[in-house]
Amino acid sequence: MAAITSSSANSRIAGVSEPVASVAGGSDLTIFMAADHSPFAKNRTLRTDFWNLFDAAGRPSYSPPDSPTPKYGTSRSGFLQSAVQPFIRRRHRPMSKQPTREAVTGVQKMTPSEAFVETMVANGVTDIFGIMGSAFMDAMDIFAPAGIRLVPVVHEQGAAHMADGYARVSGRHGVVIGQNGPGISNCVTAIAAAYWAHSPVVMITPETGTMGMGLGGFQEANQLPMFQEFTKYQGHVNNPKRMAEYTARCFDRAISEMGPTQLNIPRDYFYGEITTEIPKPMRVERGAGGENSLNAAVELLATAKFPVILSGGGVVMGDAVEECKALAERLGAPVANGYLRNDSFPASHPLWAGPLGYQGSKAAMKLIAQADVVLALGSRMGPFGTLPQHGMDYWPKEAKIIQVEADHTNLGLVKKITVGIHGDAKATAKALLERLAAKTLACDATKAERAAKIKAEKEAWEKELDAWTHERDQFSLDVIEEAKGEKTPTGGTYLHPRQVLRELEKAMPPRVMVSTDIGNINAVSNSYLRFEEPRSFFAPMSFGNCGYSLPTMIGAKCAAPDRPAVAYAGDGAWGMSMVEIMTAVRHDIPVTAVVFHNRQWGAEKKNQVDFYNRRFVAGELESESFAGIAKAMGAEGIVVDRLEDVGPALKKAIDLQMNQRKTCVIEIMCTRELGDPFRRDALSKPVRFLDKYKDYV
């Protein structure tokens, strides 16, 4: 691909006086930035001009004739205060810093706020996501000297998603906090998503003061029931003296049970004087499982003729990718990724077969259909990950299933199993390898034959993806035909989503992290997202909420600032969380967002196509330019309406992110064609009995 360079070609977007970039080497590619028609544009120019008054050292470089010496000296902050004193205050006062990040030891006198903060220090907390509030202000006041950064967000749902993303990429706690009442209720949806992703998120929920409980006061709410379905543990501080105890337990349980916990604190319990000791973190070491179940699994694997491994989220969370690889190589077994766990096995490995489940890999499905033994390593084998797809009911009903799960309640929950192992994916894989080492396996004799079959199935699937340029159902063919003469607002053409996804796949940088939202095009992307290392792919899992991808990726970027970060979203889901672009810009957390602008709620509209005779109700979306909105929020914006621009646009945005620390939104104009629905048995054909509705069938 040719390098992106500056260009003097004319832009096709009205209001843009200067082009952004083009590709050298004979191509006339132009990447167009959205025009900034924001009412804030003028103010932004004034702000830029104002800062131009300073020299490199921060001193005023210009003063009006006979201007007095600035009241607060010649530093930048002093000049600002003298110039605009009525309108701004100093952002913070000087604060002392802790010499180390170690928590205090031994029994000591402290305030409950100090006990709370010191317990977080003991657990290695460096970042918290939320919106400031009076309910926890006493603790918040000492976050900075404790070495803890509060990342202020636009909406608390975004904060909880950020904590989820932070936890999923780092393997450490993600922490979210908010004001009691509405600030806490705003987090419910995101905590539910974290629950289904098994993310160790600690939700800190300051509550109404104890003397006001039950009186229906301002922002009062019963906050524990809100989260009871989506937490592994809920701790309520019932005495300020127990602040450190409950805080520590919430952090311990989030890691040991791999899921969100809630710490509920009456707001008056942050104050006072207590004598306490900061507990040391307690970590539970998971084992490999029982001897009987391990031996039974080994016997099944030793006699298997066509073993297949299903690598799930437990492999990622247990840092077990290397052990999974070793086990696959010992067996010569193809490895399918669990649903939305595309980072659980490296895509470059010869035994990798791709993801199972909705919009997954045909190669993986065809291979697992031949299995006589399936080892589900760290996978709950959820419904979406095993449902029929591409016209294939591929799950091997006669195969012997070995399921390895850290959560014993998931064993045999969805699919019938032969052997269940309650164990850690890493420890179990090691134990199985040790037991298999001295054995002659029935599958040894056919390793080469199966390797050739794996290679052939993957090559066939890649060729099919290359040729699968657009959807082929009648509705999609109709809208493609209609779009032939239709121009985008910038004068280009609407692009086929599958071709777009293929081009994005080719342009992905090494070590990239990708989050996907819920929706039709995002679902189709499952076949095009491949990764080489774990903790790289984040999706809303079984909860399936919109507005997930952007804030989750902001949190992931906080945890891994050296890795490229890309969020996918459709235009419907994008509208729910795009305000967090302001969070990324304000706090210098650069990410890249790709918005598929197909002007509809695609996933649900597909049901109206299949079941309701194309009677479209509330599914159409006519939006302003998302790239333009991004510009108004201080980010960069790129509109893409030519296929050859897709890859260069992503590369340009990644360059902006990694080298200039800029957030960028790539708005890709897509046709209205639709991929297969999530499941075909989710609805039924309508039946009407009343005459006035008889035509609505």
Task: Please report, for each region that a protein language model flagged, where it lies by residue.
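Short, Lys/Arg-enriched N-terminal segments with co-localized hydrophobic residues
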Residues: 79-94
